[in-house]
Swiss-Prot record:
One of its GO terms (cellular component) is cytoplasm. PANTHER family: ADENYLOSUCCINATE SYNTHETASE. It comes from Rhodopseudomonas palustris (strain BisA53). GO terms for molecular function: adenylosuccinate synthase activity; GTP binding; magnesium ion binding. The active site is at 13 (proton acceptor), 41 (proton donor). The lineage of its organism: Bacteria, Pseudomonadati, Pseudomonadota, Alphaproteobacteria, Hyphomicrobiales. CDD domains: AdSS (cd03108). Pfam families: Adenylsucc_synt. This is Adenylosuccinate synthetase. It comes from the Bacteria. Keywords: Cytoplasm, GTP-binding, Ligase, Magnesium, Metal-binding, Nucleotide-binding, Purine biosynthesis.
Amino acid sequence: MANVVVVGAQWGDEGKGKIVDWLSEQADIVVRFQGGHNAGHTLVINGETYKLALLPSGVLRPSKLAVIGNGVVFDPQAFLDEVKKLQAQGVAISPENLRVAENVTLILPLHRELDAQRETAAKAGAIGTTQRGIGPAYEDKVGRRAIRLMDLADLAALPPKIDRLLAHHNALRRGLGLPEIDGAAILNELAALAPQLLPYAETVWRLLDIKRREGKRILFEGAQGALLDVDHGTYPYVTSSNTVAAQAATGTGMGPSSVGYVLGICKAYTTRVGAGPFPTELKNEIGEEIGRRGKEFGVNTGRKRRCGWFDAVLVRQTVRTCGIHGLALTKLDILDGFETIEVCVGYRLDGKEIDHLPAGEGAQARVEPIYETIEGWKEPTANARSWADLPAQAIKYVRRIEELVGCPVALLSTSPEREDTILVQNPFEA
């Protein structure tokens, strides 16, 4: 299989950035296909820490082409700020090695403001968004009133499009008690951004098709996790895009047959940010300890992540909904030293045992985890780079996860460092 799709197999924050960076050494092109700058990830390379949000991890690899696909919602200012920050760290970024789909939807300041107003007004019922305008931008895309990158190339044709956008947003703003927005202000802002953004614009579906036919290896980089998918996740506590592997085709303009191996990323435990059901959440000292060891705070927002035991039911479900061929298991080292480790192997709902997470919000909140206790290990797994470096009990834990989710572990990560990775099966050669 020449192409590889990387998706999160939990609620995001699984360590996709490191795995994508590790795989990108073998890829020619790295493509983002959904989400926006709400999904941050941290990479540590030769002791230097890089924090990415919107840009594909491939930008950190010299000679690789990084691409932002049409399935992404694109904040122009966030993009320019991130490029500038990475350039200050010595990363070479230019239109030569970074391309952006011309039909990508733009996130504007009005989207961010609306996002924040809604979350504030919802109070206890808030979803827990990053308030970066992701959802409102996707709403405008589906509502056929979005401004897209290609629109900046024809400023004379922009006013009617802005008027259509504001007919919707100013009505909302009146209802929220906010002042209306003048279309001229948006036009002036976009006109100022156009010369900075348009050099990156590309007909991405055509570019990728040409590269695929040339035999280039393409790595599709997903954001968030499959359990945040707007259709298959814990709705309504989800993101506003499809995060499952099938979106790699839709979000880039490539056909489904162009997507090869699907690699699912999951932690050796479970975390979640924001509100929503979490069957294995540990609201005790063990959960706090996992959070401290794993440094479980959001890269972009700094929000504390909720922590719990590994949920094999959920990962097995995402293996199916994403068509995952192999898993990359991360942060195994965080579990070093625990006397025993619990793994969720099933649920109990209203007195009955079930083997999947139900779709209903109420039912999701009522499920109770059924645990299997596994013996822990005392020896460290941190920085291990081969199976021989791992304690026998840690290997047993990995093997048990494989059995429970019905999917082999292809990669094992034992620290944030790029080289601390154990390869079992190379996704590009599977």
